[in-house]
């Protein structure tokens, strides 16, 4: 685990171009900025090529979209591939809504992601494995989560992050589990979206997308855990504020002190 990538990120200040969920766009922008990256957001297809050109990494969030936005997502994804920019996809609720799965499947036929990050229900859906998802939440299902993540990675030929109490990161063969975290991530709408964009930021500072993905997950989970451990009586509202503070101030040494992964 190359936690020194966090220092590289803060030194290089990579631009991350986001097609964002309007519900969480401010959380994503603030989270990236606090960590040390530079977020840009746009929904104008005419500038997609130039925006991708400026970016070190691209993150496409499927949380809230219209037909026009689907075309924008497609254009940006194709531009990212054409310009060889690392591309992260967050397939929100594809496990709960069939239309969303159809849209995501169509998009993934038109461009290739380097990393896909989702919960168990979303990753299972993309792997065509049965799972009972609940809206944007993972829901409940019976299955080997590592096998599900590996199946998705092998099917789509990319790194997959299956987020949950334990984050599973795999390229289809190698597997890393991040054991850090806090249940407060589940009550902070936008924490998953924030992580997806942070993954893109780490991908911008190393060509090794598997290393970038696992490091991003560990950094984010460990920082969230430290907030709960160091802030008295933190709740859903105050957690959001303290998380941003911690994204800005937490050092590599502090993360190493609590890091738990296998």
UniProtKB/Swiss-Prot annotation:
Q: Which gene codes for it?
A: thiM
Q: Which UniProt keywords apply?
A: ATP-binding, Kinase, Magnesium, Metal-binding, Nucleotide-binding, Thiamine biosynthesis, Transferase
InterPro entries reported in the protein's UniProt record: Hyethyz_kinase, Ribokinase-like
Q: Does the keyword tRNA-binding apply?
A: no
Q: Which Gene3D superfamilies match?
A: 3.40.1190.20
- GO-annotated biological processes: thiamine biosynthetic process; thiamine diphosphate biosynthetic process
Give the signal peptide as a residue range, or say none if absent: none
Q: In which pathway does it act?
A: Cofactor biosynthesis; thiamine diphosphate biosynthesis; 4-methyl-5-(2-phosphoethyl)-thiazole from 5-(2-hydroxyethyl)-4-methylthiazole: step 1/1
User: Where on this chain does ATP bind?
Assistant: 117, 163
- Give the GO molecular function terms: ATP binding; hydroxyethylthiazole kinase activity; magnesium ion binding
Binding of substrate occurs at 41, 190
UniProt-recorded name of the protein: Hydroxyethylthiazole kinase
Per the entry, what this protein does is: Catalyzes the phosphorylation of the hydroxyl group of 4-methyl-5-beta-hydroxyethylthiazole (THZ).
Keyword ATP-binding annotated: yes
Q: Which cofactor does it need?
A: Mg(2+)
Q: Which Pfam families match?
A: HK
**Any idea of its EC number?**
2.7.1.50
| Known catalytic reactions | 5-(2-hydroxyethyl)-4-methylthiazole + ATP = 4-methyl-5-(2-phosphooxyethyl)-thiazole + ADP + H(+)
| Family classification | Belongs to the Thz kinase family.
């Amino acid at each position: 685990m190359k936690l020194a990538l966090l220092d590289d990120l803060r030194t290089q200040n990579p631009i991350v171009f986001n097609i964002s969920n309007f519900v969480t766009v401010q959380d994503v922008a603030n989270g990236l900025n606090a960590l040390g990256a530079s977020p840009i957001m746009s929904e104008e297809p005419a500038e997609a090529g130039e925006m991708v050109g400026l970016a070190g990494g691209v993150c496409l969030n499927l949380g809230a979209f219209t037909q026009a936005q689907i075309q924008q997502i497609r254009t940006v994804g194709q531009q990212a591939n054409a310009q060889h920019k690392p591309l992260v996809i967050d397939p929100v609720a594809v496990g709960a809504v069939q239309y969303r799965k159809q849209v995501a499947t169509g998009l993934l036929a038109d461009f290739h992601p380097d990393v896909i990050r989702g919960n168990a229900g979303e990753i299972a859906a993309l792997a065509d494995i049965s799972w009972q998802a609940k809206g944007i939440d993972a829901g409940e299902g019976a299955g080997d989560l590592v096998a599900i993540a590996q199946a998705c990675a092998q099917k789509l030929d990319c790194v997959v992050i299956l987020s949950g109490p334990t984050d599973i990161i795999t390229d289809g063969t190698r597997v890393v589990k991040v054991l850090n975290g806090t249940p407060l991530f589940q009550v902070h709408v936008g924490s998953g979206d924030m992580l997806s964009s942070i993954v893109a930021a780490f991908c911008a500072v190393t060509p090794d997308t598997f290393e970038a993905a696992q490091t991003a997950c560990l950094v984010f989970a460990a920082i969230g855990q430290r907030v709960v451990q160091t802030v008295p009586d933190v709740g859903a509202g105050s957690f959001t504020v303290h998380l941003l503070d911690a994204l800005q101030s937490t050092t590599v040494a502090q993360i190493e002190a609590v890091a738990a992964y296998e």
